[in-house]
Amino acid sequence: MEIRNERQLNPVADEVSAITAVVRPILYGILYSLKAEVVEEAGGREGVKLRMLPRLRRPGSGDTGICFEYAVHDAVRRGEPDVSERVYDALSHCRVRGNSVGSILFGAEKAGSQQLIDTAEVLLTEDSVLLSGSRGRPVKLKRHLTSAAAAFRKKGAESGLPQSISGLWRADLFLGHSDTDSWVGTTVKINPLGLKGYPGLRIGVVPASQGSSDGIRKDDTKNLVICPMPYDGSFVETFYMAWEVVTAFLEADAQVPKEVSLPRPAARTVARYLADRREFPVVDVIDALGALSQPELLQTQTLSAGLVLSGGKSDIVQTTSVLAPQPTFANSSI
């Protein structure tokens, strides 16, 4: 039996802090969606000031999806409980074992993708394995990154990728456990109708539909474990509030929007955070907002417990996991 002990490190954030936390990856996503030639004329991504974003950015239909992907990645890295718990359970469905949930951006189709690929190479080790779900030994992930990037540029033709992971170039993230260095290819779609399965992809991350079930499930037709991000009063709702702040701020030429464009007091507070920093580079603003964001919430410890059977004890896992509150006793002699 698996026992997972989660200890809360920090109190749950207020609305302003929660929105601020998600604004950061949205800004990152917009910055990296800028075309390379536009960025070069502005002095490189490190030099793009926040006030320049409205003029450099060309809004597109895929912007929300790109930023949702970055927000999911960031939430996993921050230990956002609603997201990390879902990812942990989805990985368990894929039989990926470990204690430390992690996320690595890949996104070969994004502008600035070479930097993302280079970053992924740094984060991975020679022992990092990709669990594709097919029979046979897991493949070493790092050695296939370059082939995956090349496959995107050729739309999958003559990629050099093994057949079992021939669709890896379509991955947006690698989700897994950093302590066991085990990863799975993951596709992220803000529109669930756009979710498709390919060899090498194991998990599909989508927003849960408002008011409907958000349970993790296996889709046999797509050969994907579907991992809906929670909506009502949770991650997806916060994402859309943060997206509203950023788009309204950019439409107002990097100033605080009119109240009719952003009527919620919490949202206007975050917009003021941005307006106060409009003369600074976007990368520095993202870093500065970190101090105002929701900090990491949970510390997770996982262990296996033996089962007492009639006739003896066994370490064979019969039950996947048990979830229950851990009591604390303040000022108690117990």
Residue positions per predicted region:
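Active-site beta-strand-loop-beta-strand hairpin of nuclease catalytic cores
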Residues: 165-167, 174-186
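Hydrophobic transmembrane signal anchors and adjacent membrane-proximal interface regions, especially
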Residues: 3, 36, 50, 85-89, ...
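Nuclease-adjacent, charged terminal/linker segments that flank catalytic cores
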Residues: 1-97, 310-314, 318-334
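Non-catalytic C-terminal interaction segments of nucleic acid-processing enzymes
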Residues: 251-334
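Catalytic cores of nucleic-acid endonucleases
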Residues: 136-142, 150-153, 159-168, 188-266
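Alpha-helix boundary/N-cap detector
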Residues: 22, 63, 67, 71, ...
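Acidic-basic catalytic patches of nuclease active cores, encompassing PD-(D/E)XK
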Residues: 48-157
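Polar/charged alpha-helical tracts
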Residues: 14-21, 25-32, 37-40, 89, ...
